[in-house]
Design a protein with these regions (language model features):
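Histone-fold recognition with a strong bias for associated Lys/Arg-rich disordered tails
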Residues: 1-121
Length: 124
């Protein structure tokens, strides 16, 4: 397969995930921030799926704040991507390739999140 590229919308969702982390005062970018970034991107396949499921960005942000807490809003997350978020990106690349796609879109990132849940629940 030729070089796989992230679409503009996928790149925007990843940037938005960083912004969400900073807004919430978290020092890392986790799967929760990626999900919120996908929802906030607004136009990609993932955003449409999330909207059709009734998951709106502000309600997701409120749920994250309740579950994880809120720190002092700041700049870029100092700790970068969590291991789980890195795994999600890896899974999205794998899924895109498996589907024969030469790009990684928001749909692949959402698939990566879902697949990471399956991997977490598997016995070791």
């Amino acid at each position: 397969m030729s070089e796989t590229r992230f679409t503009e919308r996928a790149q925007a969702a990843l940037r938005l995930a960083q912004e969400c982390s900073a807004e919430l005062g978290h020092g890392y970018v986790g799967s929760e921030h990626l999900l919120l970034g996908l929802a906030r991107e607004g136009k990609g396949v993932a955003a449409k799926v999330l909207q059709s499921a009734g998951l709106e960005p502000e309600s997701l942000k409120a749920a994250i704040a309740r579950m994880v807490g809120v720190g002092a809003p700041g700049g870029a997350p100092s700790q970068g991507l969590t291991p789980r978020c890195k795994k999600i990106i890896e899974l999205s690349l794998t899924e895109a390739a498996r589907l024969g796609h030469h790009y990684v879109g928001t749909e692949h990132l959402l698939l990566g999140i879902l697949l990471s849940l399956i991997h977490i629940s598997e016995p070791t």
